[in-house]
Amino acid sequence: MTTTGGRGGILEDPVDLAVPVGLDAAEAAARLRATGPNTVAPPPRQHLAVRVLHQLTDPLVALLLAAAAVTTVLGDYPDTAVIVLVVLVNTVIGVVQEVRADRAIAALDRLAAPAARVVRDGRELAVPAADLVHGDLVRVEAGDIVPADLLLIEASRLHLDESALTGESVTVGRTPGEEALAGTVVTTGRAAGTVLRTGAVSALGRISALVAGTRPTTTPLQRRLSALGRVLGLVAVALSGLVFAIGVVGGRPVVDMAITAVSLVVAAVPESLPAVVTLALALGARRMAAAHAIPRQLHAVETLGSVTVIASDKTGTLTEGRMAVQQVVTSDGARYEITGTGYAPYGMVHRDGAAVAVPERLRRLARAGLLCNDAALSPPDDERSDWAAVGDPLEAALVAFAARCGLDPQTTRAAWPRIAEHPFDQAQRRMITVHRSCDQRYLVVCKGAPESILGAPLLDASAEEITELTSTAHRLAAEGLRVLAVAAALVDRMPNLAAPTGLRPVGLVAVGDPLRVGAPEIADSFDTAGVRLLLITGDHPATAAAIGGQLGLWRAGDPLGSGDDDQAAHPDTRVFARTQPEQKLDIIAGLQARGEVVAMTGDGVNDAPALRRADIGVAMGSGTEVARQAADLVLVDDELSTVAAAIGEGRRIYDNIRRFLRYALAGGVAEIMVMLIGPLFGLAVPLLPAQILWVNLLTHGVPGVALGAEPAEPGVLRRAPRSPQESVLGAGLGRDVLVTGALIAAVVLGAGVFAAHRGLPWQSVVFVVLGLAQLGVALAVRAPRLPGARHGNPGLLVAVAASALLQVGGVLFAPLRELLGTDPLGPSVLLACAAVSVVPGLALRLARRRPSLASSRHDADTA
């Protein structure tokens, strides 16, 4: 019985492995109609209007739209235009963020093979991979992308690179009866197989479904601002209603008090907050792009500052993603370390930490590994800046090792031409080659798994030698390395390849995917920043533990998570092995359920669902297109150290947003307190609606936005991340807003009462002092600087100066006086107003100098 479901199909009938003719064309066409093409299902298209409506339902955006409506009614068209522009910009950003999810799935199509070689009606044809159906007989060879999930019926020296799906950097051998999964790459050999699964039910389709079903979470900042929007809306309406009631009870006209109350609502809402956020994020994105980190959406920049956990893939992220010989042991027990980068044929040989000349025993081992080998190295070209492997990556690592030992691969192979071979097979797990020497003798070389060589009768070695080499091989394997044993002999007669004898052990070669340069230091920098680094890999637990140990993440006795246990629930687990894409999702979800803000780094197809599920996904620039499309941040230089710098940038941005909130909300609190308390001191109507809106426009506008460009504080990466549960007004910021607002209100009311007693136009004095005092606070909440450091934000000084001139102009220039309802003030009164206005800002600056206050606030008082 054959069943299908959705797009693609799965073969449930037993496959007749003896049929070489494949399907006939008619049957293939019928199955294609029944199951659909062998492609990843496209995401359901969402109408643009739905996406836009989704963005406009955000509480803060709704509050801004209400403010825009109010300012329109009041005739404050400049404010209306600014608010509408901010809403439009944020809506566009949000829609773009949703669209990129569809691109992540579309990228899976680009990973799939564009064409396939299939046998139909007994003839081999080239057909589009999308036309494959279950039951098709497909042939693949080195360099091909497997076009669908295949059940192998033939395989000759077949090795697959499954790293994009599994995260394992070592190629995997496959034999008849086993499966070759869609999207994997044939590195060596050739094979034929019957299609088992296509489209949505193939390995690629399964991951596509995970990506499609994994919706990105809202960022911590978005959650905080949404909560803030709701609170501000309720508080502003309640307090403005109280002002309205007090005025009406006091005999003021209802219409006048209604306009005043609405003006206070506008003043209490920091309508430039989205503009501040957008500017801060845009500047941060530009700085990060200059540091080779490209944010795919603006909120990713700030989210990095909230990160408490970085869940990192191993292959290609913490490691180079390329196989390399790291340690070798010659037949006399001498142990050497080999250095070098990637597959480049340059490096050094070290012993006991010191560089040494290449001894003859090591040279013989390198030569044997080079000769019993089918790989080659490809130099950099116009499209690639690094050396690359041609053939099996593990064998290419042996070629690079030989070159680092001073051997020229082409010259050496020409001097020892291969005349016979016994290819590697999964049963014996070894490869044997025979080479003719210049004196017409025969060099027999054998390489393979240690147990297949050291425990075989082909060796001519003592039991003591074999025991010592076997023990050494186990120790190297425990370090997470893949160990090969090499044996060789120079004989006079052509050997029997099926059962050679008399070979002498030449040594052991330990191959691994080495850590990137500086990876341990990067792990330390995350610890310093209070961010916990986790290692999540598809590799063997021994390999994961070894890499974790080198990074300082794991020690003997620590919990080691794996794909089939519940260690993900253990809060101390920092290393996970044998993880599948679904299990990575579970790990990320478990961390988020504990309140962590998670960044996930990766480069493979298997990382894409987790990249999308995490609070922020970070992809390597050289990784797969699928990973890059699913990520929020792409590291062009593939350097994880860039993430540490980006975390500092994210914290700077969040500090600046809080800095703006302290400034803007304190001004709103001051305005409401002046309107509420003023009548108690004989100031019947402290401010007219037009005056409130003018102060609001000048203080919340350009100066507020300029605060978003403040530089980072000293030591931003030496403090713990803020609590994920902390409100945007948390850590004392709400208290600071009230205290600062009360201080401004006290100064303003004091100046107004004094002016009233002196017979001066007190309402104009209140107007001038309120605006100048808020601008003084803007200067007081700047980022602290080291002694002697230049101020890194001259735009703020210019903005404050310009706004101060416009504020004073409101009582000096006749057209503005008529618009605002103010009276002229003399030079001496204006100087007195300016002097009094300095008090709130000066008090804040003095408070910041108190060591106890500075040490207790961290980012709560980032002013």
State where each predicted segment sits.
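Membrane-helix boundary/interface segments in integral membrane proteins
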Residues: 215-221, 773-789
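Alpha-helical transmembrane segments and their membrane-interface junctions
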Residues: 744-758, 809, 813-818
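Helix-coil boundary and interhelical linker segments in multi-pass alpha-helical membrane proteins
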Residues: 679-688, 750-762
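Alpha-helical transmembrane segments
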Residues: 651-655, 714-728, 779-792, 819-820
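Conserved cytosolic headpiece of P-type ATPases
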Residues: 1-695, 699, 703-714, 792-863
